[in-house]
Regions:
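Beta-strand-centric surfaces of beta-sandwich/beta-rich domains
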Residues: 1-269
Length: 269
């Protein structure tokens, strides 16, 4: 269990077959959050026990080591992509530059970037004005459209951190999202500013090990506001509004807070 921000976070799976009851002593704490998954009817899972099976102890230690190390840029759980596209580009102001065009069926397993940055103001401008745009399989609209800094999980400017899928190291920014496609992936950089920017991008990909049909495309969009909710939902704020099937993988929320300190604890719905 990690201790930080005046709390503890435990990610150890606690399986149960029929029910799970959680109790706490009086004055135990002031805040808690439990995340659980309900499996389809008929699924069999082992009941949790504090006595770990001998073969599970080293596996648990391996996960602990990886999480404690914050990964640091290497995609885990996938073999390294056999193909790497490296591009160094100068993107003039108010222009779009084609970075790479990949033929499918493949999946992108990592995107890494290096951007020369100046002072704090220059960082904030460059990483918000440069946008990553990716279009899969000839679709009419890009599936990925996001300022470069926000795509790698940092705003405003550069804020050093590392986690499982995104972050930054001395070598630059990294994002290890898996992005499958059937026929074609077009990767572009858009400069919404008026100053030319130099960017180095590395795109790692590998062939699909099964047909693309049914996989779905990776989507990443940035916005300040979406459709307003009815008055009885105030002050809720919409992070995502979409239709169809898919999986929600995560969100990077950047708050311009004019009132000083803020816990950042949300009531996500």
């Amino acid at each position: 269990a990690e201790h930080g921000c005046r709390g503890q976070n435990l990610y150890l799976p606690i399986p149960y077959q029929k029910s799970c009851k959680i109790v706490a002593e009086k004055d135990w704490g002031r805040y808690y959050q439990f995340v659980y998954t309900t499996y389809p009817a008929g699924t069999k899972v082992p009941t949790f026990s504090t006595e770990l099976a001998a073969e599970n102890a080293p596996r648990l230690q391996q996960v602990n080591d990886r999480c404690a190390g914050r990964i640091g840029g290497k995609a885990e759980g996938l073999p390294p992509g056999p193909d790497v596209e490296r591009t160094a580009a100068r993107v003039d102001g108010e222009t779009t530059v084609r970075i790479a065009e990949l033929a499918g069926p493949r999946m992108i397993t990592s995107i890494q970037a290096r951007v020369p940055l100046g002072d704090r103001d220059d960082q904030m401008a460059a990483l918000r004005q440069l946008c990553l745009q990716i279009t899969f399989d000839g679709e009419a609209q890009p599936a990925v459209w996001c300022p470069l800094g926000d795509f790698f999980g940092t705003a405003p400017g550069r804020n050093d951190y590392t986690n499982w899928v995104t972050g930054m190291t001395e070598d630059g920014f990294y994002a290890n999202w898996v992005m499958p496609f059937g026929k074609r992936a077009l990767v572009e950089l858009v400069n919404d500013g008026n100053r030319a920017r130099d960017v180095e991008l590395k795109i790692v990909s590998r062939p699909l090990d099964r047909p693309f049909a049914g996989m779905g495309h990776f989507h990443c969009k940035w916005h300040r506001d979406t459709d307003q909710l009815p008055e009885d939902r105030w002050p809720d704020w919409v992070m995502l509004k979409t239709e169809g099937r898919g999986r929600f993988l995560g969100v990077m929320l950047h708050v311009w807070n004019p009132r000083g300190g803020w816990w950042g604890e949300g009531d996500e719905k």
